[in-house]
Every structure is written in structure tokens, then in C-alpha cells.
A protein has these predicted regions:
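Short, well-ordered coil/turn elements that cap or connect secondary structure elements
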Residues: 63-65, 102, 120-125, 185, ...
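Short acidic-hydrophobic, aromatic-tinged amphipathic segments that line or gate anion-handling sites
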Residues: 70, 129-133, 222
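Non-catalytic C-terminal accessory region of glycerolipid acyltransferases
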Residues: 2-9, 140-251
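Catalytic core of membrane glycerolipid acyltransferases/transacylases, capturing the structured
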Residues: 40, 48-49, 78-136
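Membrane-anchoring hydrophobic helices of lipid-metabolizing enzymes
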Residues: 1-82
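Amphipathic coiled-coil/heptad-repeat helices and related helical stalk/stem segments
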Residues: 69, 90, 115, 139-143, ...
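Short gly/ser/thr-rich secondary-structure transition/capping motifs
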Residues: 63-71, 138-140, 196-198
Length: 251
């Protein structure tokens, strides 16, 4: 899930207001379109809505001087649902993944951070799930909903670290075993994803160009992990992501 922002994260993020100002004249139309797409699901397919969100992310990247480089697309399963499990660096992570993934995605997000203007519209348009991190019963309900949708063919983003702070950068925190329950229940592929330098987009006072990286690693299929416990799956995925970060010189 997209985790809660740590109190340490107090850096003035100039790129965010700068990007908003450069797109201010577009915002009314964007918000109107997102609301219409959300309110008329019978009119717009999941892919059509997702393509529009990708268009918005493209605007954010062009006007915010951000570029996302993608590697390992050949590792993505060609058919059926799956769950992307990336390391978590900052507020731009989900946008980097949308920029790097052509097929429709949804996501699980911390409920407390999901109702900001524009963020809320994106979450609703993508059919995202809002998880209450302080309510285990509600969290289990969300996991079961995600598992059902993934089994039916949807693809989800779920951040197994559950959070980040300003100092985290390209380092890893412990992956939470419970994050993997949705994929296990759906018997779906688990796709480890490595994000590099995504934190730089909103954790800097400068507006210099930023290039983020998204690396899709080979997936773990159900046949490979069915005998493992969720803590073992978490350790395996974390180790693979950590190894790739080390190979890239950021571990």
C-alpha cells in the first residue's frame, strides 16, 4: 500500500507547486473528466480510464522535468491478474509505476492520505482501495477484495514496506508479510519491482531534472511460492529487490 508520510518529511517540495501552477489552466478539465469517468463506469473501460491517468502523469512529468526509464517489461506476465510489489521511496512512486506500465493498474493506499484533492480523484478513477492501517478487520476486508479482483484479472500495486520517510531514499525497510496475502489468496504472480531515485522528485528543494527508474524483476508464480509462508515470501521478495539495488549501486 502507499504508506503514511513520516513526520520527518518536512522538506519544502517546490516541484509539486511548480507542476500544479504550470498545469493550473488544465486542472478544471482534468478533474471534471476524472469525476465523469468515475461516475460512469459503464461508459469507460478500465483501460480507457487508466490511459487518461497516464496522460495526466505524462503532463506531470513534462511540466515537472521528470523522466521515468523502464526496464524489464518482458518480465511482466502476459495474461491474467498479478500484484506489483515495489520498494517505497516517496509520494511519486505510484506515478512512476503508472508511467512505466501500459496495462491498467489499480492500487492500495493508506486511507488517511487518500482524500487530498487530485489524489482522491486518481484513486477513485483507478478503482483503488483505501486501507485503514489502524483497523485490522477493515484491512483484511480490503485484502480479500483485492484478492478477488486479482483472481478475476486485475493488476494491483501494493507497497510491502508500508511507508517511507525523507531519509529513506534508495534504502529498504522490512517488508510486511501481510502485504502478500492478497496475491497468495488469488494464487497470482508476485512481481518484485525496483524503484530508483523516485524519492528525488518531491524530496528536493531544487527543480533540476530528475530521472527515475522502474525495474520489473522476474515474477514469483504460485507454483514457486505455494509452500512458503508469507514471512518467507516477504523475505524472498525483499532479498531480490535488495540484490538489484546493490547491482545498480544503490543498495
Amino acid at each position: 500500500m502507499i504508506g503514511r508520510k513520516n513526520e520527518k518529511e518536512s522538506t519544502v517540495m517546490w516541484r509539486m507547486p511548480y507542476t500544479i501552477l504550470r498545469n493550473l489552466f488544465r486542472l478544471p478539465k482534468i478533474l471534471e473528466t476524472l469525476h465523469r469517468m468515475t461516475d460512469q463506469p459503464e461508459t469507460y473501460s478500465q483501460q480507457e480510464v487508466y490511459d487518461y491517468v497516464r496522460y495526466i502523469v505524462g503532463l506531470m512529468e513534462r511540466t515537472g522535468h521528470v523522466k521515468t526509464n523502464t526496464f524489464g517489461q518482458e518480465n511482466l506476465p502476459k495474461e491474467g491478474g498479478y500484484v506489483l510489489f515495489p520498494n517505497h521511496q516517496g509520494q511519486y512512486d505510484a506515478y512512476s509505476l503508472v508511467a512505466a506500465h501500459e496495462g491498467a493498474l489499480s492500487l492500495v493506499m493508506d486511507r488517511d492520505r487518500s482524500y487530498f484533492v487530485f489524489v482522491s480523484e486518481i484513486v477513485d478513477a483507478l478503482g483503488g482501495k483505501r486501507m485503514d492501517l489502524h483497523n485490522s478487520r477493515q484491512s483484511l476486508t480490503i485484502i480479500n477484495q483485492v484478492a478477488k479482483e486479482v483472481a478475476q484479472g486485475r493488476r494491483y500495486i501494493l507497497f510491502p514496506e508500508g511507508g517511507y520517510d525523507q531519509d529513506k531514499k534508495n534504502s529498504l525497510w522490512e517488508f510486511k508479510p501481510g502485504s502478500f496475502k492478497a496475491a497468495v489468496k488469488a494464487k497470482a504472480p508476485i512481481v518484485p519491482v525496483v524503484l530508483v531515485d523516485s524519492y528525488q522528485v518531491y524530496n528536493s528543494r531544487r527543480l533540476t531534472p530528475v530521472t527515475t527508474q522502474v525495474h520489473y524483476l522476474p515474477p514469483l508464480y504460485y507454483e514457486e511460492y505455494q509452500t512458503l509462508t508469507t514471512p518467507q515470501i516477504a523475505e524472498t521478495v525483499q532479498a531480490r529487490i535488495g540484490e538489484k539495488l546493490a547491482q545498480l549501486g544503490c543498495g
